[in-house]
């Protein structure tokens, strides 16, 4: 049976494990209508447009 030759230190284990749980950055695009930041392929919550089409009215 395979056995490790030396014990892996706690810092090496945590360093390796940290890459699994690394948070990734969320991609952000700009709304072509109002210029506000929004998630890609989603309706802009600031103005209610998806691309050039008005999807819903925004109550202000």
Curated annotation (Swiss-Prot):
One of its GO terms (molecular function) is structural constituent of ribosome. SUPFAM superfamilies: Zn-binding ribosomal proteins (SSF57829). One of its GO terms (cellular component) is large ribosomal subunit. One of its GO terms (biological process) is translation. The keyword Ribonucleoprotein applies. Keywords: Ribonucleoprotein, Ribosomal protein. InterPro entries: Ribosomal_bL32, Ribosomal_bL32_bact, Ribosomal_zn-bd. It comes from the Bacteria. Pfam families: Ribosomal_L32p. Belongs to the bacterial ribosomal protein bL32 family. This is Large ribosomal subunit protein bL32.
């Amino acid at each position: 049976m395979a056995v490790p030759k030396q014990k892996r230190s706690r810092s090496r284990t945590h360093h390796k494990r940290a890459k699994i749980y690394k948070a990734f950055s969320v991609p952000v695009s700009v709304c072509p209508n109002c210029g506000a930041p929004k998630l890609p392929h989603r309706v802009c919550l600031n103005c209610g447009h998806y691309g050039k089409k008005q999807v819903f009215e925004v109550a202000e």
